[in-house]
Amino acid sequence: EDNTPAEDATPVETRENKVIYGSTTEISGDLGNAWWTNNATDKMIRDLINDYDTVIFDQFGQMVMNATTAASIDQVHNDDGSITFTVKINEGLTYNNGEPITAADYVAYALVAYSPVTTEAGAKISAESVVGAAAYQAGETKELAGVRLLDPYTYSIQITPEKANYYFAMTYASLAPLYLPLYGGEGLTVKDDGNGAYLDGGELTVDGVNASRYVYEGRVVAGPYMIKSLDTGALTATLEINPNYNGNFEGQKPSIQTVVIVKAEDDTMMDAFKTGEINFLSQLGEGDKINAALDLVDAGGFNYCHYTRNGYGKLMFQCDFGPTQFAAVRQAIAYLLDREEFANTFCGGYGSVVHGPYSTAQWMYQDSEEFFNDNLNTYSYDPAKAVEVLSLIHIS
């Protein structure tokens, strides 16, 4: 008989594979592709449930082809100055419900976006970039001439001469899959008889387009997550991994099973974070909140990541009437603003001043930092200079 005492089993700590994200803006529940509104939390949810664009911006703001969705993107410069992008979609992509994604789903995005019905539903979508989009949006043509469904996995999109030389013109080649039954019923399909793509077999309606914005239960999506529940009254949303997601442009797939998004109140978010009511915060830009978060890190049990914001704040002038129509007035105001002091006061030493429409996180700034520093007017705080520039004009 073995009288050796049994060793005590060491309990294994298990944690639920879930993140509770505290957002500082309220969920409105509009999931309509930013064609109507673009609430920050709604956008975050849309970004988590939608994906598979054929061209994306990477972590450094550079345009890259999404190799998960696109096999190739070719472009041809046409004699009239337009550009035609031809995009071949990878086979094997599916929605979260298992239905296959083909080029028709990508073309459907353009047909719904530029549809006169979508405009009538209150969406604001410019038709300037795609050949034939203005006529299609106005209801003058059935076909969208500049968008072609070439075969089950290939589409093309023709960009107008006026937009073809845009630095980011490649982004115009990008479409994303759109699940037509969500917008127009089961009978709606995409066809192309040679004169451009068009919708057939059903009816796209204003009510259907608007209703699509607020479908939560069973919503068919193509992103890393899918909606389990969304409650605009409670200001919460619960997302779960989409098992049919093939990965982002780098092939990365989500590993956190459940993401719960809640409203984080400014006055109590740190207490909620400390007690575990919230366990993830991001985009903290105010110095007081950053310092409070770092105090929790110092106390133990928390971690953080510092990153440079891909954006900037600004003071906008109305330049077509009133005193600010004069450049000298705008310059004088700039000289009277101590932007360094403002940035330090607001950001608590965690922010910096930029001198144009760029972010220090962007690759174009990082590649040209010396040029920016040597050539841009920094408009340093200088009341005397403000008086000087104003003295050069006469305003009556």
Model regions: which residues?
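Gly/Pro-rich hinge or "lid" segments in bacterial periplasmic/extracellular proteins
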Residues: 59, 171-254, 258, 268
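Aromatic- and charge-enriched surface segment that lines or borders ligand/interaction sites
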Residues: 71-126, 150, 156, 272, ...
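N-terminal lobe/hinge region of extracytoplasmic solute-binding protein
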Residues: 22-78
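Structural transition elements
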Residues: 353-396
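Surface-exposed binding/hinge segments that line
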Residues: 122-202
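Short, low-complexity disordered leader/linker segments with a strong preference
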Residues: 1-18
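Extracellular/periplasmic solute-recognition and catalytic clefts
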Residues: 228-240, 260-321, 340, 344-346, ...
